[in-house]
Amino acid sequence: MPKWGSGRAVIRSMLAQARRGSKNSGPGLDYLRPMPAPILVEACVDSIESALAAARGGAQRIELCANLVEGGTTPSAGTLAICRARLDIPIFVLIRPRGGDFLYSAAELAVMLEDIRRAKQAGAQGVVVGVLRADGAIDSDRTRELVATARPLHVTFHRAFDVCRDANNALETLIGLGVERVLTSGQAATAPEGAETIAALVRQAAGRIAILPGGGVTPDNVAALVRATGVTEVHLTGAGVHRSAMTFRAKGVAIGNVAPRSEYEWSVTEEQQIQRVVATLRGV
C-alpha cells in the first residue's frame, strides 16, 4: 500500500498546477478556491468511548460502526442506544452485515433492511450503505430498496464506491437513486492520494450529491485536502492506540484474529486529533 506521504505529494502537485493555471484564469483556479465554511467533520467510530471522545473533540456528526479492523460492520443496538442517550450530534449508522466484499446474498440483504428499521426506531439520523453487483456496478435495485426503507433518514453510500467499476457512472446512478452523499477515497488507498479524483467528483456532482472524503485523513493533511478538492465535509477516525490496563495476561491464547496487534491494545478515537482537525478547518 502506498504511504500517506505520497498523498501529500499528490496534493502539493495539484496545488502547484492550480497556481500555474491561475495565471491565465485557467481551470487551476478551482483548486485555489477559499476554504468553504464551515467544513463539517464526521468521525468514524466503533465504540462508545470513541464516540464520546469524538463529540468532546468537536465532531459535528458520527458514523457509528463496529469492528473497524474489518472496515466496519453494523454496531450493536446497545451501542446505538447509549450513543443516542449521551450525544447531541447526528448519528449515522453503518449498515454492513459482515466484512469482505459488497456482493450480498438475499439473506444478508434481509438483515440489512431489518438493521435499517431498527436504527430508525432507535433514533438514528442517517444510515450508511453500499451494495455492488458481481460486475462491479452499483446494485441499483437493492440500493433503491435500502434507500426507500431508510427514509426519511439521510443516506450515505460508503466506500464500496471505491471498488466499483466506473466511478463516474456510479455517481450518476447514486444521484438518480436519491443518495445524499458518497464516502470515498477517490478510489485510491487514501483520500490524499485520491485527491485529484475527489476533486473531479466534486465538479461532476455540481451540488447534486455531497462528496465526503475519507481514508487517511489526518490533522496534518486535512486543510490541503479540502483546498485541493473543494469538499465541504471530511471523514476520519482520528484514532490512536489504547493499551489495556490488564495486569494478568494469558499467554498462548488468542480469542480473535487480531494479528499483528495484541488483544491487549486496540484503536480508539482520540479527542485531541478531532480537536486539531476542527481547529485547523476553522482557522484556514
Locations of the language-model features?
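Short terminal hydrophobic/aromatic SLiMs and anchors at protein ends
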Residues: 14-15, 23-24, 34
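Active-site mouth loops of central-metabolism enzymes
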Residues: 36-46, 95-113, 132, 156-167
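Hydrophobic faces of well-ordered beta-strands that scaffold small-molecule active sites
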Residues: 39-43, 62-64, 91-95, 127-129, ...
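Catalytic cores of alpha/beta
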Residues: 49-53, 104-115, 165-177, 217-232, ...
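Glycine-enriched alpha-helix->loop->beta-strand junction motifs that scaffold or abut catalytic
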Residues: 57-62, 87-90, 123-126, 149-153, ...
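Glycine-rich phosphate-binding active-site loops on the catalytic face of alpha/beta enzymes
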Residues: 63-72, 118, 122-134, 179-192, ...
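Alpha-helix-loop-beta-strand connector modules within alpha/beta enzyme cores
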Residues: 72-99, 140-159, 195-218, 262-283
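Glycine/small-residue-rich loop that forms an oxyanion/phosphate-binding "nest" at active or ligand-binding sites
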Residues: 78, 83-143
